[in-house]
Amino acid sequence: MKKNFYTISKTMSRSLKLILFSVFIGFSIFLIPQPTWAYPFWAQQKFENPREATGKIVCANCHVASMPTRAEVPQAVAADSVFKTVVEIPYKKDLQEIGADGSKVPLQVGAVVMLPDGFKLAPQERWTDEIKEETQGVYFTQYSEEQENIILVGPLPGDQNREIVFPVLSPDPRKDSNYNFGKYSIHVGGNRGRGQVYPTGEKSNNNLFTATNSGTITSIETNEDGTQIINLNNEEGESFTENLPAGTSLLIKEGDTIEKGAKLTEDPNVGGFGQLDKEIVLQSKARVIGMIIFFIGVGLSQIMLVLKKKQVEKVQAAEGI
């Protein structure tokens, strides 16, 4: 009974936090407009795990464009140690994109690091001075209360954060039998710029738009908010309209005859998402010491064999064999 009550209370607490956070974000959108904001909480609300069975990280569902992401991870780490996972999100300097309101804005970046079970964000009291300096202005969040091993960062200004340092604490299998020494996979995702699709499935203005009908363009209307309406008639005299969001750059003009599927705008996207997998070994000190002793033993055995062989050769030479 107590266990059920605890589970229900925990679920209600998590739901309440999510609702309050969503309300806060909703007010923020109106009070503090940020045209290039990316919201990791959309993924947190829709997916229990940000990595699909196919291996794709769900950020790619909205950030359709692909761009490279790199990561630096130690080959091996000791138990209960702090190490750095560095995510590199490269793009050209001073690059700008169109915001949701159609204006030109700097790119922002974000990253996700999916660690093996037991690995988590290192507590700040264990950060070195170097790590503290490298993570200034960076705010880390875990994907959910139950998933300490999935760490999110962003959105952050891209110009100052093309490299994001994640301080990670490794587990200690000697103290917790749920974890084992061995080789593990780390999944990393990095993004720069806005997505091409909203979580609702609608296309953002960060897209190439094509004609949904054929015909001749009779007029192009521009509204106060920057959105545009393309009016056209086909050969049968039917009228159609193409609605374009703010910030798009037209490739067509009045009087042009276009076919269905023809490009209406330039492709404004300059960003993209990339992901990769890395491997890390959780090393046992006892095993390392054992290996060293083993190799020393093998080396000494080889030396003894060589010395013994030379001794035998000397005896044989003395006896004239």
Curated annotation (Swiss-Prot):
Its cofactor is heme. The 4 large subunits of the cytochrome b6-f complex are cytochrome b6, subunit IV (17 kDa polypeptide, PetD), cytochrome f and the Rieske protein, while the 4 small subunits are PetG, PetL, PetM and PetN. The complex functions as a dimer. This is Cytochrome f. The keyword Iron applies. One of its GO terms (biological process) is photosynthesis. InterPro entries: Cyt-f_TM, Cyt_f, Cyt_f_lg_dom, Cyt_f_lg_dom_sf, Rudment_hybrid_motif. Binds 1 heme group covalently. The gene is petA. It is found in: Cellular thylakoid membrane. Belongs to the cytochrome f family. Residues 1-38 form the signal peptide. Keywords: Electron transport, Heme, Iron, Membrane, Metal-binding, Photosynthesis, Signal, Thylakoid, Transmembrane, Transmembrane helix, Transport. One of its GO terms (molecular function) is heme binding. Component of the cytochrome b6-f complex, which mediates electron transfer between photosystem II (PSII) and photosystem I (PSI), cyclic electron flow around PSI, and state transitions. GO terms for cellular component: plasma membrane-derived thylakoid membrane. The chain crosses the membrane at residues 288-308. Heme binds at residues 39, 59, 62-63. It is a single-pass membrane protein. It comes from Prochlorococcus marinus (strain NATL1A). It holds the Pfam family Apocytochr_F_N.
